[in-house]
Amino acid sequence: MNLFPPNMKSIRILTVLVLSALSGAVARAHDKSAELDAGQKAFLAQYEKVRVALAADDLTAAKSAAAPLAKDLAEVAKEQTKAQSAADAAKKLTAATSLAEARGAFKAVSKRAVHYAQGQKGYYVANCPMVEGGEGDWVQTSTKISNPYFGKSMLTCGSIKE
């Protein structure tokens, strides 16, 4: 005994097909690694060097790694005004005289990194709830937390958001 008339069965099949197609599109939208251009990939690679240095409490290495970021972001900011705050922050990071100052500037640079990395394969957005203002997001290439905001004193504080 068929509970649905033939045309209802066709509608159900069509609905299942449409939903299947949509779920595949959503999954592909989350994995948009092919959409990163060479400049964005270079930015994220250099950003990772800054993050690792800050997690290790190495101000000299963080400042050194931030210099190419500052230069590249200044160029991007000429065409994209949204990049200006990250460019200014990267420049401040290169001139930082303390880890606290460098980490403060790193927050603004991290906003740009999160923008690029969200949904990208191989990049993880992490968060430390202890960062003032709840703005403790950063990007890393490993699922093992390595906190750049508190370094060695709270190296594993945080969690992967996405």
Region locations from a protein language model:
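Bacterial N-terminal signal peptides that target proteins for export
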Residues: 2-18
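Intrinsically disordered, low-complexity terminal tails/loops enriched in metal-binding residues
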Residues: 20-23, 27-162
